[in-house]
Curated annotation (Swiss-Prot):
InterPro entries: G3P_acylTferase_PlsY. HAMAP family: PlsY. Keywords: Cell membrane, Lipid biosynthesis, Lipid metabolism, Membrane, Phospholipid biosynthesis, Phospholipid metabolism, Transferase, Transmembrane, Transmembrane helix. The keyword Lipid metabolism applies. It catalyses: an acyl phosphate + sn-glycerol 3-phosphate = a 1-acyl-sn-glycero-3-phosphate + phosphate. SMART domains: G3P_acyltransf. This is Glycerol-3-phosphate acyltransferase. Its EC number is 2.3.1.275. It is found in: Cell membrane.
Length: 202
């Protein structure tokens, strides 16, 4: 029972709509009505500006990071292969990612999984996150497309999981990668049409 509570709590924390709350609290704006209509970090930068964008990014990363440690902090017991699987920090983190993308507080319409996924990886493998961040910002510098950089970094995460033989990370990264591509499908279409907006701060 405690494992179920832990996973629900992880989802609810992940579902906290940082961009929406910051927009409403400090700018009196519903971020869903501006830009891409997304509540995540990228749209927060576009609509609310750099300081708010960085704050939203931090909060979204923190959501993923903090829940990874729930199996250590909460009184959960793994007594078999199934409970062991669901008390793995990566699996707990995956529920936070689902919450971020499909938040119950906003009618299940949230962000695109990038920052919260980064927080989960930070909690379980900081070195891998550094490598993925270098790839992300390298692609971003060359293309100026956040969406493309995110997709390529997610593919590299799958490859990295195989190289280090972390098979739970492999499973989670494939799931998140598919989710990320689904959430960025309109961005992909706009890239091919040459209509995807490029960042201007790099």
């Amino acid at each position: 029972m405690m494992i179920v509570i832990m996973l629900i709590l992880s989802y609810l924390i992940g579902a906290f709509p940082s961009g929406y709350v910051i927009g409403k609290l400090f700018f009196k704006k519903d971020i869903r009505q501006f830009g891409s209509g997304n509540t995540g970090a990228t749209n927060s930068f576009r609509v609310l500006g750099k300081p708010a964008g960085f704050l939203v990014t931090f909060l979204d990363i923190f959501k993923g990071f903090i829940v990874v440690f729930f199996p250590l902090w909460l009184p959960v017991q793994a007594e078999g292969p199934i409970t062991t699987f669901f008390t793995n920090g990566l699996i707990v983190g995956a529920f936070a990612i689902l919450g971020h993308v499909y938040p119950v507080y906003l009618g299940f319409k949230g962000g695109k999984a990038v920052a919260t996924s980064a927080g989960v990886i930070l909690g379980v493998n900081p070195v891998l996150l550094l490598i993925l961040a270098a790839i992300f910002f390298g692609i971003l510098y060359l293309t100026k497309y956040v969406s493309l950089s995110s997709i390529i970094a997610s593919i590299c995460c799958v490859i990295g999981a195989l190289l280090i033989r972390d098979y739970i990370l492999f499973i989670v990264s494939i799931g998140v990668g598919v989710l990320l591509i689904i959430r960025h499908r309109t961005n992909i279409v706009r890239i091919f049409k040459g209509e995807e907006p490029k960042i201007k701060w790099m």
